[in-house]
Amino acid sequence: MKVFILAHQDDEVFLLPHILNSEKKLFIYLTNGVSVNAGNRELRLRSLEAKEVFEKHLVRLNSEVIWWGLEHSIPEGELYKFVNQESILQIAKVIGEQDLKSLQLVTTTFEGAHQDHDASAVISRELGKFLRVEVIEVSTYPQWFSKFYSFKVMKPQQLDKSIEFSRSKVLLLTLKLIKGYRTQRLTWLGLATATVTAYAFRTYHSAK
């Protein structure tokens, strides 16, 4: 079983080679998906959208979900404030109800792409130590040039295992997920082409 520990309701797009199988999966989203200044309407839209996408595309892949960030009112961009023992123990309690013998945690790696992705990595590493399970980290979009707003996509600085996957199935689900996250179109306007290109032509690696 794999437990996906993700900051945002669309981060799964970067982990699809780990997701597209019949293995049992649990997704834990650590933020509510909107900024601290967002209104109730924006939060409702984002939450409804995320639930619709999950029901339509991920449930059929033997997946369950816990909207942890929504339940605990954790805004996007501020997950680092919840990197503490209390949060880790709360999440560990949920994960501990699963079969730990064959369990892996999958998350985004610490690479400076987004502070929430980095916080997810820190939380997952601590969970891995506490639960004594393997943690797999995946690159999202690390900064390319330090002085310019530019990013690589899914190119970890250190490569771990390469992962075999069906390019056609991953590409199709990528497009469906991006289309489903309507409130995130501005974000994906800059990332979609690079993400599709990476899945179409590159070897997919997890990150150390």
Functional labels for PLM-detected ranges:
Residues 49-63, 75-82, 130-208:
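The feature marks non-catalytic terminal segments
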Residues 1-134:
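Active-site beta-strand->loop->alpha-helix modules in alpha/beta enzyme cores, enriched
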